Amino acid sequence: MTDVLVVVKVFPESDEVNLDNLYEEIGKKLPAGYKLVRKETEPIAYGLKALIAYVQMPENVEGGTDTLEEIINSIQGVSHAEVVGITRLGF
């Protein structure tokens, strides 16, 4: 079994949410077998930025990326999270 790299765009509730702290909180909530690989920010509007999180996770997980979205959406300070990309790692 191989892993996939999932790109998740995380929209904060406001511009007062610290994206570095949000990234750390996501890392704490991830189940075993998942890991944060990298982060970026993307301007949205009026000074608000989205967090782009790259998450490595097992390919054959029940619920797929829906479970990952649910975990991130449950974190305080997150308005909405959505998967914007996925790619298979290895062969």
From Swiss-Prot:
Keywords: Elongation factor, Protein biosynthesis. One of its GO terms (molecular function) is translation elongation factor activity. Coiled coil: none annotated. The keyword Protein biosynthesis applies. Disulfide bonds: none annotated. PANTHER family: ELONGATION FACTOR 1-BETA (PTHR39647:SF1). This is Elongation factor 1-beta. It comes from Sulfurisphaera tokodaii (strain DSM 16993 / JCM 10545 / NBRC 100140 / 7) (Sulfolobus tokodaii). The gene is ef1b.
